[in-house]
Swiss-Prot record:
Family, similarity comment: Belongs to the MOB1/phocein family.
Function text: May regulate the activity of kinases.
Keywords noted in UniProt: Metal-binding, Zinc
Disulphide-bridged cysteine pairs: none
Stretches assigned to coiled coil: none
Cross-referenced InterPro entries: MOB_kinase_act_fam (IPR005301), MOB_kinase_act_sf (IPR036703)
One Pfam short name: Mob1_phocein
A single GO molecular function term of this UniProt record: metal ion binding
Record gene name: MOB3A
Lineage of source species: Eukaryota, Metazoa, Chordata, Craniata, Vertebrata
Official protein name in the record: MOB kinase activator 3A
Zinc keyword on record: yes
Length: 217
């Protein structure tokens, strides 16, 4: 039986933006393969996120940040036709949580935006971070900057907000496509990873606290 969610994922018109990949033959490509092999083997996600012996933490984090960016991008891309200026005039996670956009360019102060506008700015911003050689060096031997993990925390905290919005405001669409299991697995993978390395503040996780307690016990 075909899965409509997977059809949406692989429909080029629905793909939010091109996937960032690792160059074959590089250390990160090998790490990415190792991480994917663990997932495909059905390894407990708590174990799958742990740093493999002898590997560099920053490289391991880089591989996962890129992977999560690609996966969350696809998840949002599949429900984006139902996330409009009219349906989601404010980027939020239910009535208690509103997310305002701030950057170093146009929005220097936290600014209320519609969810689709926020998402567009967010994905552009993360893509720029990932492609910044000073922050995510691709050459072997080039050291990571001292603020690397601090920058990653900001990226992952903002990516988490996509999960919040999708789960709270668009879960009916996810259910309609029969893709709860896929999205839940992506979420659990993300959650176990950020918890393993302390990459998101507990208060940022609050909006999905009850769901997470049920899902990630």
């Amino acid at each position: 039986m075909s899965n409509p969610f997977l059809k949406q994922v692989f429909n080029k018109d629905k793909t939010f933006r091109p996937k960032r990949k690792f160059e074959p033959g590089t250390q990160r490509f090998e790490l990415h393969k190792k991480a994917q092999a663990s997932l495909n083997a059905g390894l407990d996600l708590r174990l799958a996120v742990q740093l493999p012996p002898g590997e560099d933490l920053n490289d391991w984090v880089t591989v996962h940040v890129v992977d999560f960016f690609n996966r969350v991008n696809l998840i949002y891309g599949t429900i984006s036709d139902g996330c409009t200026e009219q349906s989601c005039p404010v980027m939020s996670g239910g009535p208690k949580y509103e997310y305002r956009w701030q950057d170093e360019h146009k929005f220097r102060k936290p600014t209320a935006l519609s969810a689709p506008r926020y998402m567009d700015l967010l994905m552009d911003w993360i893509e720029a971070q990932i492609n910044n050689e000073d922050l995510f060096p691709t050459n072997v031997g080039t050291p990571f900057p001292k603020n690397f993990l601090q920058a990653v925390r900001k990226i992952l905290s903002r990516l988490f907000r996509v999960f919040v919005h999708v789960y709270i405001h668009h879960f009916d669409r996810i259910a309609q496509m029969g893709s709860e299991a896929h999205v839940n697995t992506c979420y659990k993978h993300f959650y176990y990873f950020v918890k393993e390395f302390g990459l998101i503040d507990t208060k940022e996780l609050e909006p999905l606290k009850e769901m997470t307690a049920r899902m990630c016990h």
